[in-house]
Amino acid sequence: MDTKRRVLDLTGYRGYISYERGRLKIGERTVPLAEVDFILLGQKCSWGYGLVAGLERFDVAAAVCDWRGVPISALYHWSSNTRVFARHEAQADLSLPRAKNAWKQIIKAKLRGQANALDAMHRPHAEQIRTLARTVKSGDPTNIEGQGARVYWSSYLPGRGFRRDQVSDDVVNGMLNYGYTILRGRVLTRVISAGLSPTLSLFHRNRSNAFALVDDLMEPFRPAVDYMVYRLLQGGSSELGSEEKTALVSVLAEKVSDNQDFTVRSVIENFCSEFALYVEGKRDTLKVPIWKLSMSEPGALKEGE
């Protein structure tokens, strides 16, 4: 059971953050770290070794943010996984067919999640994306992912003139980028915890990207952020303010289904562990979670095929 619920947004806090006996002291208040899932640290915060050690002990992720409140780096601890060397070696030796098959499963799950997101938003073309998902081949040589993206983003916010752009500073792209950054930070900590190298990837390749595997494994979770951004816009949000940031971080705490206590956070952890077993040859097929709207939560993930 994943009991952690709280997200601490300290981007506006000015002062020292201390740690003592399992609790954070933030000014005059204290917060049990056992109840914390994620911390956002602002440029006016200061802290010492005690905080870092406490985060490691209670397995809490933290992001360091710039003056805009946008995460620019993360605090994470070294993996204590006893199979770290074996898994790094297995990643380096992973055969091309198995790597391509894993990427196929990831893209199929991402596309199905995007189709589910369009359904949840009452947008057209969900079935078109599902049809594309069924045509994905090993390694996605015909770039079905890109074809699906064009359909998806053209249907995402019709009538607003929206265009998905990773470097744009408009409100919608800013919200999406912020949510993806939070997601990336969580996947990074779970990749390392699973004893995996974040650099040895399946698909993403960039000489300057030390977290290429993280970018691979976060793909199926993107629709959870997309749907939250949609909900914020429907609720009247017109800026990336503190309330919007808190909502985007809260995506990690969404329940997986109506009758289980697993959250996006724990599903990410399970998925990274499954991927580690896959690269070691202990799984024949990589099972990838698929995002789907839940009746009891803003969004949910279900196990893939």
Task: Specify the residue positions occupied by each region the protein language model found.
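Extracellular/luminal Protease-associated
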Residues: 27-28, 34-50
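Short hydrophobic alpha-helical runs that function as membrane-insertion/retention elements
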Residues: 25, 39-41, 60-66, 70
